[in-house]
């Protein structure tokens, strides 16, 4: 069973979460996690000014996703940073190229989930995932979130990401906060849970 993890990461926070999601997927017998990043849309000059060139070298080895790969996956988990309460433009552009899959119904019935990151605690994580769900519903996919069976999302002893809608992390205003162990545990849980649901859907 092929679980595709498609994401965009500018400074590495979503990449680290994607790795944790993949770890969770691989805990399910017979499940294979495949990491892919969506194409970059910003110019090298802009990335340089944003301080993103060096951080992105850490995951430059991850192959760039193609739309056709979505159709061949048994389940898909998407990762995007929050941009003003919505998914990032790179992910939006990638998804906008899936019209052919929609016409064919290629994604109908596939399990799907979303994880995200934001600079602040209340920086739009939930709205980002919920608006992403609109795309999944239009494609006929089966949405899988992060249930409260993952108790880590109810912790109040530390700043933490995660909601019933999906795993998440808080990066800090300057990207100085890396995903905590609790954030990563939520990502692993969601990866494992999506793979488990996909296995049931695929019989």
From Swiss-Prot:
Residues binding NAD(+): 11
HAMAP family for the chain: NQOR
GO CC terms: membrane
Cofactor(s) named in the record: FMN
Organism of this sequence: Geobacter sulfurreducens (strain ATCC 51573 / DSM 12127 / PCA)
Domain Flavodoxin-like residues, every copy: 3-194
Name this polypeptide is given: NAD(P)H dehydrogenase (quinone)
Cofactor note: Binds 1 FMN per monomer.
Annotated PROSITE patterns: FLAVODOXIN_LIKE
Family statement: Belongs to the WrbA family.
């Amino acid at each position: 069973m092929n679980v595709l993890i498609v994401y965009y990461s500018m400074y590495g926070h979503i990449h680290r979460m994607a790795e944790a999601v993949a770890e969770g997927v691989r805990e399910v017998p017979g499940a294979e996690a495949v990491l892919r990043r969506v194409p970059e849309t910003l110019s090298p000059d802009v990335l340089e000014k944003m301080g993103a060139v060096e951080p992105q070298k850490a995951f430059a080895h991850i192959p760039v996703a193609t739309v056709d790969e979505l159709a061949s996956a048994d389940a898909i988990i998407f990762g995007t940073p929050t941009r003003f309460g919505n998914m990032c433009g790179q992910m939006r552009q990638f998804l906008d190229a899936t019209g052919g899959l929609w016409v064919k119904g290629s994604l109908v019935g596939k399990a799907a989930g979303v994880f995200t990151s934001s600079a602040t605690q209340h920086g739009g994580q939930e709205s980002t995932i919920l608006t992403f769900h609109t795309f999944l519903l239009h494609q006929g996919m089966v949405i899988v979130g992060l249930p409260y069976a993952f108790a880590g999302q109810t912790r109040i002893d530390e700043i933490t990401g995660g909601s019933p809608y999906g795993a998440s992390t808080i990066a800090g205003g300057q990207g100085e906060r890396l995903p905590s162990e609790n954030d990563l545990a939520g990502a692993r849980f969601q990866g494992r849970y999506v793979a488990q649901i996909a296995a049931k859907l695929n019989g």
